[in-house]
Amino acid sequence: MPLSYQHFRKLLLLDNEAGPLEEELPRLADEDLNRRVAEDLNLGNLNVSIPWTHKVGNFTGLYSSSVPVFNPHWKTPSFPNIHLHQDIIKKCEQFVGPLTVNEKRRLKLIMPARFYPNFTKYLPLDKGIKPYYPEHLVNHYFHTRHYLHTLWKAGILYKRVSTHSASFCGSPYSWEQELQHGAESFHQQSSGILSRPSVGSSLQSKHQQSRLGLQSQQGHLARRQQGRSWSIRTRVHPTARRPSGVEPSGSGHNANLASKSASCLYQSTVRTAAYPAVSTSENHSSSGHAVELHNLPPNSARSQSERPVSPCWWLQFRNSKPCSDYCLSHIVNLLEDWGPCAEHGEHHIRIPRTPARVTGGVFLVDKNPHNTAESRLVVDFSQFSRGNYRVSWPKFAVPNLQSLTNLLSSNLCWLSLDVSAAFYHLPLHPAAMPHLLVGSSGLSRYVARLSSNSRIINHQHGTLQNLHDSCSRNLYVSLLLLYKTFGWKLHLYSHPIILGFRKIPMGVGLSPFLLAQFTSAICSVVRRAFPHCLAFSYMDDVVLGAKSVQHLESLFTAVTNFLLSLGIHLNPNKTKRWGYSLNFMGYVIGSWGSLPQDHIRHKIKECFRKLPVHRPIDWKVCQRIVGLLGFAAPFTQCGYPALMPLYACIQSKQAFTFSPTYKAFLCKQYLNLYPVARQRPGLCQVFADATPTGWGLVMGHQRMRGTFSAPLPIHTAELLAACFARSRSGANILGTDNSVVLSRKYTSFPWLLGCAANWILRGTSFVYVPSALNPADDPSRGRLGPCRPLLHLPFRPTTGRTSLYADSPSVPSHLPDRVHFASPLHVAWRPP
C-alpha cells in the first residue's frame, strides 16, 4: 500500500503527534527507510516505458521549439544622449569628500572599460543580421538596421570607415583623442581632432592625385580640408617598413580614395543640387567598399573623370528598365532624392586594425513580456563564452536572500529608481572595437543569399540581368510597406555597414560585472553622503530608503540631481514609490522579513494546478519547475531538501513521475509560505556537538548527553545534535563546530532527515566554535566532568559580500511628522 500523505507528514515530524525527538529524528537518517519511502512515492523509478510529457502549463521541455513572433509595428526605443562624465571620480569627491579605495577602484574599471578576449573569430558580413524570422526577412532586416542606426546616432556604436578609422556621434572622451601611433602622439585640439593637415597628408594627396588623375575632385577636397574637423590623419612615419615616409594605409578619408570614390559614387544632378555641400567622394559606403566594389568594371576607377558611374545597387534601378510589375525600379522612382549613400559621424578617430567582418549576429525581439510594442536588440557575442578560447568572466558577489533581508528589512520607506539603458552608460575603450563588431552586408547581398533562385555564382555582378535577379513580388510588397515607415532611409539602410560598440554591449559576460561594480560604487557614495538613509543596487535596479515619506522625497530630489550631474539618465516615469514594503529582486521586503512577490506565488499556484500525476515528465520541464519552486523554497517548511528527488532526476537526465502523495506534499509546502526574517545580533549561549556514537548539548549551565542506537556519519550526527539543541532550548543562536551544519545546506543528507531538519532549524543562526573551545565537546564524548568555561560568543548578522563600505548609522525607530530642519539631510548634504 503506497504511503498516504497523512502518514508521510507524520513521518517527517511535520505534525505534533510524534514521540520524543531524540528517538524519532535519528530514524529518518536510516538508509533503509529512505529507500522504502522513495519506492512508495515512486521517486527512484526513473526508467519508464511510457512516452514522456514535454509540456506542463507554460513550461516546455525537450524537442519543443517556441516560434518567435515578429511584430512589423515594433517601435525602436529612443536612447537619450547618454554621456557619463569622464571626471566622475572628481565629481563624486566634490559631493562626498575623498572616495574609499574600493569606490575608486570600481569607478576606474569603467572609465573606460576594457575587453581583452583570447581569440576573436571573424564572420562574413552576411551573418551580421540573423535570419531569425524566415517569414519576415526583409522587414526584420530594415527594422534591425534602423535600430543599429539609432544606436549609432545616440553615440553607442562606432561606424567603421576604413581599416583604421571610425566615426561616431556624441561627445568624445579623452581616450578617443589620445590616439597614439608608434612613439609619437597626435597634436590634439580641444575637440580631439586634428585641424591642420600634416606633411604626410599633403604628400599623400599629391601621391594619390598623380595616381588617380582626379584633379578636379582633389582640388575641391584640398580646399575643404582646412575647414573639416576630421582632416587626414597621416603624417611622415619613420619606420623600417615604409622607407618612403608616407603611410598610404592611413586613417584619413582619402586613404583609399580609389576604392572609396568608386565604391558608391552617384553623380545624378538631383544629388548635386540637393546636397551641394556634400562632396561626391564623401558619399562612399561606410565600411563597405570591400563588399560593393564587385559592381564595377575593373577600369572604372581610372575612367571616373571621363564618365559618371552609379554603382550604388539601389540607385542603379533608376536607370534600368522595369523587368516586371514587381520590379524594384518602381520603388526607386518614387523619390527624386534618396539622400546620401552613407551618413557621417560628428567625430573621426583612429582605431586598431578592424577587418570588414562581424564578430556576432544581431536580431530583434520584444522589449519584455509586458511590452511587445517596442523592440530590443539581441547581440550574440557567445563566441567569447564558448570553445577552447572562452573568456572566464569575473565573478561578483550577489547578496543571498538572508543577506538581502538583513540589509533591507527595516521600518524604512522605499522608492526604486530606473536607470534608462544602464549598460549603454559605460564607455568601452576603442581598442575593444575590433572584437565587438556587428553589421550587415547590405540588402542586395542579404536578399541574394536568402532567395532560392540566387544566381550570384557566375560573378557577373555588374550586369543588369543580375541586378534584377533580386526583384520579386515578396520583396516589392515588403519594400512598399517599409517605404511608408522609413522613406528615403530605405536607400541608406540598403548599403553595407560595419559597427563596433562604443559602450558596453549586453551580449558579453563582462557587461553585468562592470554594471554591478559601477552601480555599487555609486550607491556607496550616496550612502556616505546621506548617512541616515540606505541606498542599494543590484545591476540597474537602485533603491533608496529613508525613515519617513517626507525625508524620502527630499532624498530623492538630492540623489536624482547628483546622478544627473554625473551623466546618469534616470527614467522618471518608472520611479516607483513602495511605501514600507519594498519590491526588489522578485521579493517583497518589509519590517517583518521577505516573501516572494505575488506574481511568483500566482505562477506556483498555476504550476501545481497543471502538474500531472502518474505521467513521466521530461527532465527539461522538471528543470523549469525546479527553477520556479527553488526561488520560493527558502519560504517553505522543508526548503530545498524537499526538491531533491527532482534535482536527482534532472542530473541523471531521466523523466520524473509525480506520485499523488509527493505532489500533495509539495502543494502543501508551497501553499503556506513563511517569511524569512531578519537576523538579530545576540550572544550565543547554547552549544551542540556530536561524535558518530553520541551527542552533547550545553544550554547556559545545563548539560545534556545521549547516544545513537547505531554509529552515524559525523555530519549527520552533528546535524541531529543541532536539531536537539534547537528543540530543547528554543534558542535561535546555536554554536557548532561543523561547517556543513553552519552552511545551512541540508541537501546532501538523507532525504527525510534533510526535510525535517530544515523545518526544525528554520530561522536559526549559527556561530562557529572551534572544537577545542566547544563546551559541548565533553558531553558528546560521554564526559560530564568539570564544566568548561562558557564562551562569550557574539553573533553579528552578515550582509554577505555586498560591501556596504560605509556602515549607515542605525535609524531611530520613531517616525517624525515632517523632516526637521536639523534633519540628517541638511546636516550631511553639501552642495556639489
UniProtKB/Swiss-Prot annotation:
It comes from the Viruses. Residues 346-589 form the Reverse transcriptase domain. Hepadnaviral virions contain probably just one P protein molecule per particle. Mg(2+) binds at D418, D540, D541. Residues 178-335 are annotated as: Spacer. Residues 210-220 have a biased composition (Low complexity). This is Protein P. Activated by host HSP70 and HSP40 in vitro to be able to bind the epsilon loop of the pgRNA. Because deletion of the RNase H region renders the protein partly chaperone-independent, the chaperones may be needed indirectly to relieve occlusion of the RNA-binding site by this domain. Inhibited by several reverse-transcriptase inhibitors: Lamivudine, Adefovir and Entecavir. Keywords: DNA replication, DNA-binding, DNA-directed DNA polymerase, Endonuclease, Host-virus interaction, Hydrolase, Inhibition of host innate immune response by virus, Inhibition of host RLR pathway by virus, Magnesium, Metal-binding, Multifunctional enzyme, Nuclease, Nucleotidyltransferase, RNA-directed DNA polymerase, Transferase, Viral immunoevasion. Its EC number is 2.7.7.7, 2.7.7.49, 3.1.26.4. Disulfide bonds: none annotated. The keyword Cytoplasm does not apply. Residues 336-679 are annotated as: Polymerase/reverse transcriptase domain (RT). Signal peptide: none annotated. The keyword Methyltransferase does not apply. Residues 186-206 have a biased composition (Polar residues). It comes from Hepatitis B virus genotype D subtype ayw (isolate Australia/AustKW/1991) (HBV-D). It catalyses: DNA(n) + a 2'-deoxyribonucleoside 5'-triphosphate = DNA(n+1) + diphosphate; Endonucleolytic cleavage to 5'-phosphomonoester. PROSITE patterns: RT_POL. One of its GO terms (molecular function) is metal ion binding. Belongs to the hepadnaviridae P protein family. The gene is P.
